[in-house]
């Protein structure tokens, strides 16, 4: 099974507002950068999109070390998601899970892979996390002044 490192980040100008996501995939000496964005979104949605896009870009089952600076993504995928699925995508307080369609997409995107989730402190000088942040900001740029509704660039 191919081993991949994935670094993901999301960004938002206003929350909600225009946002972007970025991801870096690294295996052996190869690097692939991905980015995209939306006109009206939240930071949490962009963090989820970065992880979904990174995993969805893999063309075969892989062992993935996925690095995120999002506590929301880390806690959701490592703990909350199993309870949400058992509860019909409701929280412990019986409220609908926010961003349920993205959590469902992330759950689906991870299925073919063995994913090891890692949290890194954002904006702390981690080079790949900093680059993922740059990609997220680039992905957001077309929407900051009223551009399209969404964009994905590989």
From Swiss-Prot:
Sites where the protein binds Mg(2+) 1: 9, 47, 69
Q: Name one GO biological process term.
A: DNA replication, removal of RNA primer
Keywords of this entry = Cytoplasm, Endonuclease, Hydrolase, Magnesium, Metal-binding, Nuclease
Name the cofactor(s): Mg(2+)
Which terms in the Gene Ontology molecular function aspect does this entry carry?
magnesium ion binding; nucleic acid binding; RNA-DNA hybrid ribonuclease activity
**Pfam families referenced in this protein's UniProt entry, alphabetically:** RNase_H (PF00075)
Residues engaged in binding Mg(2+) 2: 9, 133
Localisation per UniProt entry:
Cytoplasm
On cofactor binding, the record's note says: Binds 1 Mg(2+) ion per subunit. May bind a second metal ion at a regulatory site, or after substrate binding.
Catalyses which reaction? Endonucleolytic cleavage to 5'-phosphomonoester
Example GO CC term: the record gives:
cytoplasm
Give the enzyme's EC designation.
3.1.26.4
Q: Which InterPro entries match?
A: RNase_H, RNaseH-like_sf, RNaseH_domain, RNaseH_sf, RNaseHI
Is Phosphoprotein among this UniProt entry's keywords? no
> Residue ranges of the RNase H type-1 domain?
1-141
| SUPFAM superfamilies, sorted | Ribonuclease H-like (SSF53098)
Subunit structure and binding partners? Monomer.
Q: What does this protein do?
A: Endonuclease that specifically degrades the RNA of RNA-DNA hybrids.
Give the family from UniProt: Belongs to the RNase H family.
Entry protein name = Ribonuclease H
Q: Which organism is it from?
A: Brucella anthropi (strain ATCC 49188 / DSM 6882 / CCUG 24695 / JCM 21032 / LMG 3331 / NBRC 15819 / NCTC 12168 / Alc 37)
Cite the source lineage.
Bacteria, Pseudomonadati, Pseudomonadota, Alphaproteobacteria, Hyphomicrobiales
Annotated gene: rnhA
């Amino acid at each position: 099974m191919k081993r991949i490192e994935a670094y993901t980040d999301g960004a938002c100008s206003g929350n909600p507002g225009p946002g972007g996501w970025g991801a870096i995939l690294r295996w052996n000496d190869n690097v692939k950068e991905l980015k995209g964005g939306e006109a009206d979104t939240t930071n949490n949605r962009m963090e989820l999109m970065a992880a979904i896009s990174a995993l969805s870009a893999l063309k075969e089952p892989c062992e993935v070390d996925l690095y995120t600076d999002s506590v929301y993504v880390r806690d959701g995928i490592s703990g909350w998601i199993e309870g949400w699925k058992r509860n019909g995508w409701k929280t412990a307080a019986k409220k609908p899970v926010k961003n349920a369609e993205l959590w469902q997409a992330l759950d689906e995107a991870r299925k073919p892979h063995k994913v090891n989730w890692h949290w890194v402190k954002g904006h702390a000088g981690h080079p790949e996390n900093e680059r993922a942040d740059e990609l997220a900001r680039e992905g957001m740029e077309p929407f900051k002044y009223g551009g399209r509704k969404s964009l994905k660039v590989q």
